[in-house]
Design a protein with these regions (language model features):
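Hydrophobic faces of well-ordered beta-strands that scaffold small-molecule active sites
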Residues: 2-8, 28-32, 62-66, 103-105, ...
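Membrane-targeting and insertion segments and their boundary/processing signals
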Residues: 4, 62-69, 161, 165-168
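Active-site acidic/histidine proton-transfer and metal-coordination neighborhood
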Residues: 12, 74-209
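Acidic (Asp/Glu)-rich catalytic clusters
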Residues: 18-26, 43-63, 93-97, 195-202
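Glycine-rich loops and low-complexity Gly/Arg-rich segments
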Residues: 31-34, 54-58, 87-91, 128-130
Length: 209
């Protein structure tokens, strides 16, 4: 069954309130997350309960989480990944206890998502996100990071937090030996580790390609 939902970036970051979302015909709930919790840390049950209560007070439901971000150690396959996987499992447990059973995530290295233009103008005057591989191939990662952040018009973008800039070069170094095959193997390792918890609570993991 399809449920109509809208992405909501939280009361601190979204200019569209829950009350306005509620007025959209057919919309039953929102897709949201806890933006201030860094990847790798456990989501406390109390924080999930507070977010759920805030959404439900407007007459909507949390229909999914996007995202519970995955720590780089899990993607790289570092020895300390076991602790971060354990934290992720605890987060899934807490979400399951509150009946939140759809979790989006990605397994992309370094950047959670990449666009080369956040406001590409179309012939009708509207703007869209755009990606050009030639731009990515020709630019220094740190310069690209700064350009993307500066074009965000003051909005905080998940996966592009300023604190990541300080370690972006270190991340590229950490990922240098991670081949496509190794990245996939690490994904399989992660999924096998969380599978029992997902089955216990009926959680559907939706990977962002």
């Amino acid at each position: 069954m399809i449920h109509m939902s809208l992405r909501w970036f939280g009361s601190k970051h979204d200019t569209v309130s829950l009350e306005k979302i509620k007025q959209i015909p057919g919309v039953e709930g929102v897709i949201t997350t806890l933006y201030d919790i860094p990847a790798g840390q456990t989501w406390p049950l109390q924080r999930i309960q507070a977010l759920k209560a805030e959404v439900e007070a407007s007459g909507l439901k949390i229909l999914g989480i996007e995202s519970v971000n995955i720590h780089d150690s899990i993607k790289i396959g570092s020895p300390d990944r076991e602790q971060y996987i354990a934290n992720y499992i605890e987060t899934l447990e807490n979400l399951g206890k509150e009946g939140i059973t759809t979790v989006c995530y990605n397994f992309m290295p370094v950047f959670d998502w990449t666009r080369t233009d956040l406001f590409k103008k179309r012939p009708d005057g509207s703007t869209v996100l755009a990606y050009d591989q030639k731009v990515v191939d020709a630019i220094d990662p740190e310069v690209f990071f700064n350009q993307t952040n500066s074009s965000a018009q003051g909005f905080e973008m998940p996966g592009w937090e300023p604190e990541r800039l300080a370690k972006v070069k270190d991340l590229f170094e950490a990922y240098k030996d991670v081949t496509e095959e190794k990245l996939f193997d690490n994904l399989v390792y992660f999924l096998k580790a969380i599978q029992p918890t997902c089955e216990k609570w009926g959680i559907k993991m939706a990977i962002h390609p």
